[in-house]
């Protein structure tokens, strides 16, 4: 009795050249996506709210490869303008941390720059208001000092016996 065993051909167990190239491209993309999101996390620290979250594609080899990713960061202003300036700088640095920032990364960096500029404007306005209040107070003290001797006060006579 003869017996036969089936062995799959090498063509069916190995990927063809086109599939191998596709897998290699997916591996490179996966590596870049992970490095990109890790750069955000490394710089972001306490700004990171969630992530990384990845979108995957299944390659011809049946494995999943990350093809996109995101990290959610806190982009809200801080309690005060003075605290907002360094936070905005941190947000911008986090957004631009990857060596290849995406359009979304540039958009977040622009928002952070606007937040920083607004906070600096608020700080400058508060300083102007404080100086104006100090000048007004100084002028008031100066006027009071002028009248201290009584010589500059308008004359008034009071006759209690009239």
Task: List PLM regions with ranges.
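Type III/flagellar secretion export determinants
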Residues: 1-162
């Amino acid at each position: 009795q003869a017996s036969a065993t089936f062995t799959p051909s090498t063509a069916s167990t190995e990927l063809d050249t086109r599939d191998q190239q596709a897998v290699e491209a997916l591996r490179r993309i996966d590596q870049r996506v992970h490095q990109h999101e890790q750069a955000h996390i490394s710089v972001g620290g306490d700004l990171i709210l969630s992530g990384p979250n990845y979108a995957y594609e299944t390659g011809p080899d049946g494995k999943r490869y990350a093809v996109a990713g995101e990290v959610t960061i806190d982009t809200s202003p801080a309690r005060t303008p003075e605290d907002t300036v360094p936070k905005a700088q941190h947000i911008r640095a986090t957004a631009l941390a990857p060596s290849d920032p995406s359009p979304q990364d540039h958009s977040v960096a622009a928002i952070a720059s606007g937040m920083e500029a607004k906070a600096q404007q608020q700080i400058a306005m508060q300083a102007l208001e404080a100086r104006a209040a100090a000048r007004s107070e100084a002028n008031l003290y100066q006027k009071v000092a002028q009248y201290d001797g009584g010589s500059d006060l308008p004359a008034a006579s009071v006759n209690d016996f009239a």
